[in-house]
Curated annotation (Swiss-Prot):
One of its GO terms (molecular function) is rRNA binding. It holds the Pfam family Ribosomal_L9_C. HAMAP family: Ribosomal_bL9 (MF_00503). This is Large ribosomal subunit protein bL9. Binds to the 23S rRNA. It comes from the Bacteria. InterPro entries: Ribosomal_bL9, Ribosomal_bL9/RNase_H1_N, Ribosomal_bL9_bac/chp, Ribosomal_bL9_C, Ribosomal_bL9_C_sf, Ribosomal_bL9_N, Ribosomal_bL9_N_sf. Keywords: Ribonucleoprotein, Ribosomal protein, RNA-binding, rRNA-binding. The lineage of its organism: Bacteria, Pseudomonadati, Acidobacteriota, Terriglobia, Terriglobales. GO terms for biological process: translation. Belongs to the bacterial ribosomal protein bL9 family. One of its GO terms (cellular component) is ribosome.
């Protein structure tokens, strides 16, 4: 089944793309959630108009994302956690923790925009990618320290 995406769908395509999907995926997920429409000749003409508007919107969003990215310069997120002798954390630091800490610093964002392959389970310095726009990604430094080390300082 061919569908036209009405908005970006992760791992499938961007708004306005004509993609081939399984019948069930199209009829049971994409169409009911209004993420896509069937690829007919009439719909393709409508999508061309939507693409023109989308190009302007995407340019504006990219500009906004770039200005927001500049605000993240010099921002470091620091966590103190209990850890064992081998610097293994009792627990972990997740994207949710990082998003909450960034919110305390005045940045309101969705935790799903943070890219962390797996939760941080050791002390040290890490980089977490924050995807503000499909063309704008910022690396945020994350420092995880042992509770005893912080108390000693």
């Amino acid at each position: 089944m061919e569908v036209i995406l009405k908005q970006d769908v992760e791992k499938l395509g961007h708004q306005g793309d004509v993609v081939k999907v399984a019948e069930g995926y199209g009829r049971n997920y994409l169409l009911p959630k209004k993420l896509a429409i069937e690829a007919t000749a009439a719909n393709k003409a409508v999508i061309e108009q939507m693409k023109a508007a989308a190009v302007r919107r995407i340019a504006r969003e990219k500009t906004d994302a770039e200005s927001l990215a500049k605000q993240f310069d010099g921002v470091t997120v620091t966590f103190t956690r209990r850890a064992g002798e081998s610097n293994q954390l009792f627990g972990s630091v997740t994207t949710s923790d990082i998003a909450t800490e960034l919110e305390h610093k005045g940045f309101k964002l969705d935790r799903r925009k943070l890219s962390l392959v797996e939760p941080i389970k050791t002390t040290g310095d890490f980089k977490v990618a924050l995807k503000l726009h499909r063309d704008v990604t910022v690396d945020i430094p994350v420092h995880v320290a042992k509770e005893a080390e912080v108390a000693a300082q």
